[in-house]
From Swiss-Prot:
The gene is rpoB. Keywords: DNA-directed RNA polymerase, Nucleotidyltransferase, Transcription, Transferase. DNA-dependent RNA polymerase catalyzes the transcription of DNA into RNA using the four ribonucleoside triphosphates as substrates. InterPro entries: DNA-dir_RNA_pol_bsu_ext_1_sf, DNA-dir_RNA_pol_bsu_external_1, DNA-dir_RNA_pol_su2, DNA-dir_RNAP_su2_dom, DNA-dir_RNAP_su2_hyb_sf, RNA_pol_bsu_bac, RNA_pol_bsu_CS, RNA_pol_bsu_protrusion. PANTHER family: DNA-DIRECTED RNA POLYMERASE I SUBUNIT 2. GO terms for biological process: DNA-templated transcription. It catalyses: RNA(n) + a ribonucleoside 5'-triphosphate = RNA(n+1) + diphosphate. It comes from Caldicellulosiruptor saccharolyticus (strain ATCC 43494 / DSM 8903 / Tp8T 6331). This is DNA-directed RNA polymerase subunit beta.
Length: 1229
């Protein structure tokens, strides 16, 4: 066996086991976001403005045109300032508007401010109101023409077809059981197909047969109509019939009916196929695909030259079919089974370059063009420049974005031909029929909605305002546009709060594809087929990375090499094969899913010699959805890389090929939840993707130019560039991410060091020398240990705690605002009533905690007082008021305190106040933000995981001296349960452990790329080289007794992650706290400082034991007997006996409810005396739980539900019982 070869990944050298020659580097991983947004700025905005202009008033006197747009100046604040100030990172958008008055010929031009437009940051995110957000790309059904088949009750095949636009009315073809053909307009009313054809001008049987051929189904429909015995003009009758169906109850007339049909399908304002819809429609309805391989039933003649292209009875080849289409022949007769003749009708489109003799590339028309319009243009002039000019002017007629009558006839012909096997039905889950709407397009649609609303306002104002004094500024109201944009960024389900636990989470979030959202599917209606892996996903969407839970398969991830083409379809790259020589070339082609289906594609790992020739004679290839074996000369393409089928997070799993897919899914998802640790360490066993993932995620600082490091400090690097300029790089120190993890950058260059462009000069969170480093390499042993690793629990050594191996920093943000209340303004102050000096020793003179102070739960962070309500003053108080002025007015303490179970060290304080000119929400005078950092060591109850879906909860931390140790005395760090491996079939973890053991001994870092990594013999060889046992097992000694264990144990180095599900965030206890308003029962949940629900089943358990008194107090004084719980509290404080419980509040609620249903309910005691139900005790008597008031306030601010909304809480949520990862991936956060 050959030794692995050294490969340089950034600054790190790894020994790579990869054998496949990489022709193409990984593309820039955030391209889908950046490119799409750039398209929107360059073209998308212009398209929308062009669509809407000109806006005319009803008399067509005034014209308002949008001429051009530009961004005026840089953003007001930097990205960092926006986050601190809760501002939006945006630039002002200005639009040049021209107002033309046709009567006077007067023209007014103005630049109109169209609001602040959010701008994408360098890393593909948006900052909206201070929060970093990501716009997820949406995967939706592409507009186009689709046909489907189903089997009816009699076992016959029935076909249906649909033309789906980007926006506008659908047109659906249906067959009923008696083979009558009908059309459904706009998903509502059915009319006969022949009625529609008549309305389109084929007004009698002869015309219909001439156009579509004689078909029994058409005859049957026509006969049925003939039986109705209509008189008059058939076209008008058809139009009126359609109008009656679509607008029942309105008096029909021909003019209205005509307009309605025009508006529905032929008017660009109401019907839009978009570029992609036109492309798909032409592709589907073009003639050549349907006549290819059929037998011609007549001589096919090129009308322009008189040349016979195909003789009658010949099979039409692919070449001939394409020539027929380009010759402008739109109807061809072919033989179908039993020598029947069928007429195939196309949609009259041709390639432009076959008709003009100049280069058409500069016209920017890639689609097929509509022949009648082209002929019209070519017949008017022979001058090349005039033709070009006319083509540019009539581009929307040549490539119409709405339907043409020819489209409808071609679709009808396709629909009729399906019965004879002409054409094929579509698979809607195929990626050739689903397209990606990325940021740019989603924004464009939103902008279009805003402009459409603005257009209505402008039209109204045009009629109202005085024509002479009107200017563009007075007509335009930008509110609808800014509101539409704000609404999209703020509340669209596709605009997500960025997942920022670690760099990988952020990167994946930006490369995500969602089938949910407006215009997409909904979770409940999505069936199994949509969610399933499809053969067309290969190299485009990852088959592994998707959430577990209700969103499985609906939210997916972009594959590593995939890219989105101009129509929004996903493409993936392949290497071309020279078929003559059976040699793989380095030429790369990108193919969409439907193009790929016609090629035979070999695997990237297919063995080739030095020159790239296939070694094997027979080669396994993919062909459509099948996997077949062919001769080596038949192979068309070869995969570009073995990792092209998976996403970035999946390609980070070494030995993925040895893991079960379900576990690999968990592994991919859990890597995104790894907490950035205090010190980072890249994996010994990597896959070679770590470097690109870290660099492209944008958390590392890269050098902009070649130069020499002049100065390095913790928070800035100065580089003197070779071209004489100087660059200063500012590093972010201890910033809080969206999820409360710590974002910290640190320099990895020295003074005087030479740096190259694009070199990593500073590491971010979870990176190590520019490589992604989510966890730590630790020594693991697979063996049971005293039952402490039962059910996937993990036993760890105290060394991991002492040496801060798995210590992470978490930063919480607390905010306090001083508002204006009805009784006067709140005040942030050190002077708090009834608080001892001890409690405010760490506050500065303003009443704000000093940086560096250590705080624990209940400590004051910001002192704040709120005016109390006025009461009747006594004479003495009035006297004091008169002497001392207002100061003696009552205030109460509403300071911001550290919540329960929190604490740490204050690392930052930000103060914003209206007096300093900061922008604050209305009614807020001052805003203080305090950042508190905690160092969290790993502890019992934390969740850890490897990269192979092997997760577990820490059950015990053992002293180092008790851990099992190796023969040389090294204690292991972690003991895992061997039973977690066989049934789960993630053998990758074992191979990683073995290879890690050898690599550690040899001092290597290893890269073992997915599907192209180290084999079993490679690992054995590495173990031999390191002088270790080739089976990877070692004798272990018990740390407590020093005796060896009976059997040899698998020991080695594994990369283990600490996940964000930390026990400190989950553990919770309450004695007294807030109660629900209506039922007076304690709230539930940690966020509400709630209690544990004692549910129905728990009550049964106590009943079974007959524990009557325990049950009674649980249901009364510990829950909702208001008077009883106050008295009980007093009794405990005074040391007396606990009194008799009273009547629970919820019982009173029940009685009231029955009374509200007009039932007179009375309570009687044993001796038939009526028991008075006392109303609930007054507000003053009600005990306020620990700071319940602030918590109530906080709930309202955090948008938690109010107390009075009855809630049902789950039973005690144990720290180990995860709300599993599916929730984290939920699309509407």
């Amino acid at each position: 066996m050959a030794l692995p070869r050294p490969v340089q990944y950034g600054k790190v050298q790894r020994m790579s086991y990869g054998k496949v020659k990489e022709v193409l580097d990984l593309p820039y991983l955030l391209e889908i976001q950046k490119k799409s947004f750039q398209w929107f700025l360059d073209e998308g905005l212009r398209e929308v403005l062009r669509e809407i202009s000109p806006i005319k008033d009803y008399t067509e006197n005034l014209l308002l045109e949008f001429v051009d747009y530009y961004f005026d100046g840089p953003p007001k604040y930097s990205e960092q300032e926006c986050k601190e100030r809760d501002a939006t990172y945006a630039r002002p958008l200005k639009v040049k508007v021209r107002l033309i008055n046709k009567e006077t010929g007067e023209i007014k031009e103005q630049d109109i401010y169209m609001g602040e437009f959010p701008i994408m940051t360098e890393t593909g995110t948006f900052i909206i109101n201070g929060a970093e957000r990501v716009i997820v790309s949406q995967l939706i059904r592409s507009p186009g023409c689709y046909f489907a088949s189903s089997i009816d009750k009699q076992g016959r095949k029935i076909f249906s077809g649909t033309i789906i636009p980007n926006r506008g009315a659908w047109l659906e073809f249906e067959t009923d059981t008696s083979e009558l053909l009908s059309v459904r307009l706009d998903r509502t009313r059915k009319v006969s197909l022949t009625t529609l054809l008549k309305a389109f001008g084929l007004y009698n049987q002869q015309l219909i047969f001439n156009k579509l051929g004689e078909d029994e189904r058409l005859k049957a429909s026509l006969e049925k109509e003939a039986n109705k015995g209509e008189i008059g003009n058939p076209v008008e009758n058809a139009l009126l019939e359609i109008y009656r169906r679509l607008r029942p109850g309105e008096p029909p007339n021909v003019e209205n009916a005509k307009n309605l049909l025009e508006r529905m399908y032929f008017d660009p304002r109401g019907y839009d196929l978009a570029k992609v819809g036109r492309y798909k429609l032409n592709k589907k309805l073009s003639l050549w695909k349907r006549i290819f391989n059929k037998r011609a039933a007549e001589d096919i003649v090129d009308k322009r030259t008189g040349e016979i292209l195909v003789k009658e009875g010949e099979i039409i080849s692919r070449e001939a079919a394409l020539n027929i289409q380009d010759a402008g022949i739109n109807e061809v007769l072919v033989y179908v089974e039993d020598d029947k003749v069928f007429k195939v009708v196309g949609n009259n489109t041709v390639k432009l370059d076959r008709y003009v003799d100049f280069d058409v590339s500069d016209l920017n028309i890639k689609e097929l063009v509509y022949l009648p319009v082209l002929n019209e243009i070519l017949s008017t002039t022979n001058d090349v420049n005039e033709i070009k000019q006319l083509i540019k002017e009539r581009e929307r007629e040549l490539v119409p974005y709405c339907l043409t009558r020819d489209d409808v006839f071609a679709a009808t012909s396709y629909f009729l031909g399906l019965k004879y096997g002409i054409g094929h039905i579509d698979d809607i889950d195929h990626l050739g029929n689903r397209r990606v709407r990325a940021v740019g397009e989603l924004l464009q649609n939103q902008f279009r909605i805003g402009l459409a609303r603005m257009e209505r306002v402008i039209r109204e104002r045009m009629t109202i305002q005085d024509i002479d004094s009107v200017t563009p500024q007075t007509l335009i109201n930008i509110r609808p546009v800014t509101a539409a944009i704000k609404e999209f960024f703020g509340s669209s389900p596709l605009s997500q709060f960025m997942d920022q636990v670690n760099p990988l989470a952020a990167l994946t979030n930006k490369r995500r594809l969602s089938a949910l959202g407006p215009g997409g599917l909904s979770r409940d209606r999505a069936g199994f087929e949509v969610r399933d892996v499809h053969h067309s996903h290969y190299g485009r969407m990852c088959p592994i990375e998707t959430p577990e839970g209700p969103n499985i398969g609906l939210i997916t991830s972009l594959a590593t090499y995939a890219r989105v083409n101009e129509y929004g379809f996903l493409e993936t790259p392949y290497r071309k094969v020279d078929k003559k020589e059976a040699r793989v070339t380095d030429e790369v082609v990108y193919l969409t899913a439907d193009e790929e289906d016609t090629y035979k594609i070999a695997q990237a790992t297919e063995p080739v010699d030095e020159e790239g020739r296939f070694i094997n004679q027979r080669i396994t290839v993919r062909f459509g959805e099948d996997i077949i074996e062919v001769d080596k000369h038949e192979v068309d393409l070869v995969d570009i890389s073995p990792k092209q089928i998976v996403s970035v997070s999946t390609s980070l799993i070494p030995f993925l090929e040895n893991d079960d897919a379900n576990r690999a899914l968990m592994g991919s998802n859990m890597q995104r939840q790894a907490v950035p640790l205090l010190t980072t360490e890249s994996p010994i066993i990597g896959t070679g993707v770590e470097y690109r993932a870290a660099v492209d995620s944008g958390v590392c600082v890269l050098a902009k130019k070649d130069g020499i490091v002049e100065k390095v400090s913790a928070d800035e690097i100065v580089i003197q560039n070779h071209d004489g300029t100087k660059d200063v790089y500012h590093l972010l120190k201890f910033k809080r991410t969206n999820q409360g993890t710590c974002f910290n950058q640190r320099p990895i260059v020295r003074k005087g060091q030479e740096v190259k462009t694009g070199e990593v000069i500073a590491d971010g969170p979870s990176t190590d020398h520019g490589e992604l480093a989510l966890g730590k390499n630790v020594l693991v042993a697979f063996m049971p240990w005293e039952g402490y690793n039962y059910e996937d629990a993990i036993l760890i050594s105290e060394r991991l705690v002492k040496e801060d191996v798995y210590t992470s920093i978490h930063i919480e943000e607390y905010e306090c605002e001083a508002r204006d209340t009805k009784l006067g303004p709140e005040e942030i102050t050190r002077d708090i009533p009834n608080i001892g000096e001890d409690a405010i020793k760490d506050l500065d003179e303003r009443g704000i905690i000093r940086i560096g102070a250590e705080v624990k739960s209940g400590d004051i962070l910001v002192g704040k007082v709120t005016p109390k309500g006025e009461t009747e003053l006594t004479a003495e108080e009035r006297l004091l008021r008169a002497i001392f002025g207002e100061k003696a007015r009552e205030t109460r303490d509403t300071s911001l305190r550290v919540p329960h179970g929190e604490g740490g060290i204050v690392v930052d304080v930000k103060v914003f106040s209206r007096d300093k000119g900061d922008e604050l929400p209305p009614g807020v005078n001052q805003l203080v933000r305090v950042y508190v950092a905690q160092k969290r060591k790993i502890s019992v109850g934390d969740k850890m995981a490897g990269r192979h879906g092997n997760k577990g909860v820490i059950s015990r931390i053992l002293p180092v001296e008790d851990m099992p140790f190796l023969p040389d005395g090294t204690p292991v760090d972690i003991v895992l349960n061997p039973l977690g491996v066989p049934s789960r079939m993630n053998i990758g973890q074992i191979l990683e452990t073995h290879l890690g053991y050898a690599a550690k001994a040899l001092g290597w870092k290893v890269a073992t790329p997915v599907f192209d990594g180290a084999k079993e013999e490679d690992i054995e060889e590495a173990l031999n080289l390191a002088g270790l046992s080739p089976n990877g097992k070692t004798i272990l000694y018990d740390g407590r007794t020093g005796e060896p264990f009976d059997n040899e144990v698998t020991v080695g180095y594994m990369y283990m992650l600490k996940l964000v599900h930390l026990v400190d965030d989950k553990i919770h206890a309450r004695s007294t706290g807030p109660y629900s308003l209506v039922t007076q029962q304690p709230l539930g949940g940690k966020a509400q400082f709630g209690g544990q629900r004692f549910g129905e089943m728990e009550v049964w358990a106590l009943e079974a034991y007959g524990a009557a008194y325990t049950l009674q107090e649980l249901l009364t004084v510990k829950s909702d007997d208001v008077t009883g719980r106050v008295k009980t509290y007093e009794a405990i404080v005074k040391g007396e006996n606990i009194p008799e419980p009273g009547i629970p509040e919820s019982f009173k609620v029940l009685v009231k409810e029955l009374q509200s249903l007009c039932l007179d309910v009375k309570l009687l005691s044993e001796d038939n005396k009526e028991i008075e139900l006392k109303e609930s005790i007054d507000e003053d008597e009600q005990p306020q739980g620990l700071g319940a008031f602030e918590r109530g306030l906080e709930e309202v601010e955090n948008g938690e539900e109010d107390d009075d909304k009855e809630k049902f809480y789950e039973d005690l949520m144990d720290a180990s019982q995860e709300q599993d990862e599916s929730a984290d991936d939920d699309i509407d956060e």
